[in-house]
Regions:
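Terminal amphipathic alpha-helical/low-complexity segments used for targeting or macromolecular assembly
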Residues: 1-102
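Structural signal for interior beta-strand "rungs" in well-ordered beta-sheet cores
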Residues: 99, 103-197
Length: 199
């Protein structure tokens, strides 16, 4: 899947110290394409494979490069501004976009670009980081956090205040993985590298 794209990302990451403004500009279309793949669910930082999980390190590399191609900027809405490099996932959404998404997004939710939100998911006021995957029918309850690149399966309940750890570096580190049909209790913290098996 996306072998040419992967090769370009790998090459850019291996030579990241030498990337100048022109090189970063030239790389932006590939990085935006990766973000779109993550948001659509067509690519995942970690995916089930042969009874286990495979980490796609090149997607983590793309996320790290994505940070480099953005300057800090004011975002959000009047009266509630943010100062960040990563755009909000839903900042340009209208009613039709939300209908297509098929998830419920309650006021107070912060989801960053590059996060996947499955059909019939419910996001109470919570935080979903870049590269995270929230499966279909999953509820992320109030003040819960799904960290960068964390993978949450379908029909899960991430209870109020729970933290699902995120990890971008080291690249080979496995993100936190919550498989399908799991209940994570209130105020629980599931840290990087932990896999909670299917419920």
């Amino acid at each position: 899947m996306n072998t040419e794209l992967q090769a370009r990302i790998e090459h850019a990451f291996d030579n990241r110290a030498a990337l100048d403004v022109a090189a970063i500009e030239a790389l932006k279309p590939d990085l935006y394409h990766v973000i779109a793949l993550l948001e659509s669910g067509d690519a995942r930082v970690a995916e089930p494979q042969d009874g286990g999980w495979k980490v796609n390190e090149w997607l983590k590399k793309a996320v790290l490069l994505y940070f480099r191609c953005h300057d800090m900027d004011v975002m959000g809405e009047p009266g509630n501004p943010f100062w960040d490099k990563v755009p909000l996932r839903f900042e340009n959404y209208d009613a039709e976009d939300f209908r297509r998404l098929g998830a419920r997004v309650v006021p107070g939710t912060v989801a960053r670009a590059g996060s996947y939100i499955g059909k019939d998911a419910v996001l109470m006021p919570s935080f979903i980081n870049i590269g995270a995957h929230v499966g279909a029918g999953t509820m992320v309850d109030t003040w819960a956090t799904v960290g960068s690149c964390a993978q949450v399966g379908a029909r899960c309940h991430i209870s109020g205040g729970a933290g699902i750890g995120g990890v971008l570096e080291p690249l080979q580190a496995s993100p936190t993985i919550i498989e399908d049909n799991c209940f994570i209790g209130a105020r629980s913290e599931v840290v990087e590298g932990v896999i909670v098996g299917e419920g």
